[in-house]
């Protein structure tokens, strides 16, 4: 039997033998066509080659391109499961010529493959040509020998292809297979062409013109070829059937869904099994290409596909998540051709299971509401749109899921009322937001989101993409264009630029159009998902709705990724060394450094910092894989994932895991697990090195570490090493002996300082170190007074001097003011015990403090101290004190 895999291989090998380059399928998320939600044809990845914007090292190519048609103008979702040939995911086989061969060789290659390689009977084939394409008509006669009645001229747009209103275009020639008169339907161009008897299996597009404008079309100097053959369709033909769902690939998937559910694919259950098999393919491939279920853009299309399949699983009586259990069969069937399925198996499986668990919680309640609301409805009636909106808003039912659930009863939904309810919710949200105190400028982003939706973020998968300008803002107002030298903000429908959040700063780079270059200085996220690109027009003029190319500064992004992953490792290391009380209180992730704030009641010792750094670097040296997955927030927390300070999370969260905990040489668990929407390295080894450069206090109970990574850390340590060698030279010792040499010097200094201090105290008491003549003992109102100003005596030693002075005079008041090298004054004043009943040392020392610029003083009645910044007024302070005693 011709299996799907063998047919694909035969096609590619055939064209390779005929001089074509086998080119891998491009991702389902187009990088070079922002007008498309998903890749839906083989030529999408070659669009810029056909238009001359891109050159490739080959002139002929062949591909097996994965495609999705669900959402946007190409939407087959509603029909999947109910027809023989509609799919959300399909493979497009194609061969392409970029200005090389043209019609004759294209027709020959296609006819030869079908009749010689695939061995299709010639009498089962017929072709169509554009009504005035005489060249193709004659070539078909010559090459195939088909009679004129099997070369059908078609005058409609079905046989003329155009890339858009302008650009490459040309006539088509379609090849049909006749399944026989036992199946209803007529040939193309007839009144019964919509039947299933004649099925198009291959479309050959002859790009020979350029549409200059609506009225003008000119010949291309180098005409090209673009062909497309649906793999599922040709497989059905080659396997002797006319229904795509009867091919080996779908039979394998449906066999497993029958086995798991215990329900045969017969009668009313055929559609459910087919929906599950088809939707598993599109879901798995979209997840593998970086799309995750969400409530916006591509992610919402994926969610709609998944939930539609989940409702059909419910119809089959499945009590547990079903789709993920079919995944091994899909990977067995398609994993060799598409290794991305194998690489992403864990992510796909977990995402499918998670989404089904999450939706199952509301599915039955929502279906109960739908059943109750539609009980009295009959065929041809409409379900109230407000009920459909409640199912959407409260129970997570996409509109098309509700429509699909009612389809078998012939009941539709009042879509206009549904849309009205949706608009009412948006208006309520706007009213609530307008009272939140945000600035007028911020209000713009809410308006943009309301009209255009959230920005599609592509930055996890790529640093370069195309997009369409959806808003230009200058001086707080939306404008139609911006010109060179003007600072402005750009909004694009999709972007690889990361918007600042979770401590990670926004990306920078360039956005360029046909006639302008815009330098992005920063990227921010506003209004729950609108990415704004802040910067300046460097040249030219940008206009609304223009197609642009967005390029992130990759070097800067790489440094940010490294630092962000390093914060995760440091966070876990802090918890292991200091304790589980450590929680993140804030962070900054920039290209130059990282900063991490955390809860801890005291400073972190040098020994602890070394342990933290060593632990983090051990994980760096593991070079273990950094993985991301989507989980329910409660499940993530229960698995030990740590949340970021100040972040708000929805029901589903992105979980980043890195590092391995090993037990007896086997993986026990991941080392660090955090909820995080930021960008990260692929492996911990990409970080290179982590070095903590400082630790400090931010607030009571909050500490901060700052660190460098990679090259920055290496250069920092290299400079530190150079400084150590310089110091060693100054000390006339080796670098390894610097620590001991410094310790000896400090000990010598301590001894010398003690000796010097002792001599100073002796000198002061003997009157040797004085600043003025006021050091003599004087009698004031019968009270002995000793006042002295001394230099470089510590407050503690001043107390010793005052005690000695009190003993020396026997009865009286002693005041010493020490002036430090930085000019500050410290005052200590003592009153002998026999005088404390009438003189208080605290009151007297405050007189000194006032002159020294201090804030009072304190102590006991017999001994008090104070100080101030104005040590140069020490003499004046003593004079004022004496005057007070004379009072």
Curated annotation (Swiss-Prot):
Enzyme Commission number(s): 6.1.1.7
UniProt-listed InterPro entries: aa-tRNA-synth_II/BPL/LPL, Ala-tRNA-lgiase_IIc, Ala-tRNA-ligase_IIc_anticod-bd, Ala-tRNA-synth_IIc_core, Ala-tRNA-synth_IIc_N, Ala-tRNA_ligase, Ala_tRNA_ligase_euk/bac, DHHA1_dom
Instruction: State its location(s).
Output: Cytoplasm
Task: Output the Gene Ontology cellular-component terms.
Answer: cytosol
Keyword presence, Oxidoreductase: no
Q: Which UniProt keywords apply?
A: Aminoacyl-tRNA synthetase, ATP-binding, Cytoplasm, Ligase, Metal-binding, Nucleotide-binding, Protein biosynthesis, RNA-binding, tRNA-binding, Zinc
Which parts of the sequence are annotated with region: Disordered?
Answer: 854-873
Where does the chain bind Zn(2+)? Answer: 564, 568, 676, 680
The entry's free-text remark on the cofactor is: Binds 1 zinc ion per subunit.
Which cofactor is recorded for it?
A: Zn(2+)
**Span of the secretion signal?**
none
Among the GO biological process terms of this entry, one is: negative regulation of DNA-templated transcription
Q: Which residues form a coiled coil?
A: none
Q: GO molecular function terms here?
A: alanine-tRNA ligase activity; aminoacyl-tRNA deacylase activity; ATP binding; tRNA binding; zinc ion binding
Q: Does the keyword RNA-binding apply?
A: yes
Which reaction is the catalytic activity of this chain? Answer: tRNA(Ala) + L-alanine + ATP = L-alanyl-tRNA(Ala) + AMP + diphosphate
Q: Which domain of life is it from?
A: Bacteria
Q: Which NCBIfam families match?
A: alaS (TIGR00344)
Print the domain comment field.
Consists of three domains; the N-terminal catalytic domain, the editing domain and the C-terminal C-Ala domain. The editing domain removes incorrectly charged amino acids, while the C-Ala domain, along with tRNA(Ala), serves as a bridge to cooperatively bring together the editing and aminoacylation centers thus stimulating deacylation of misacylated tRNAs.
Q: Which family does it belong to?
A: Belongs to the class-II aminoacyl-tRNA synthetase family.
Q: What does the UniProt record say this protein does?
A: Catalyzes the attachment of alanine to tRNA(Ala) in a two-step reaction: alanine is first activated by ATP to form Ala-AMP and then transferred to the acceptor end of tRNA(Ala). Also edits incorrectly charged Ser-tRNA(Ala) and Gly-tRNA(Ala) via its editing domain.
Protein name per its UniProtKB record: Alanine--tRNA ligase
* Species per Swiss-Prot/TrEMBL record: Bartonella henselae (strain ATCC 49882 / DSM 28221 / CCUG 30454 / Houston 1) (Rochalimaea henselae)
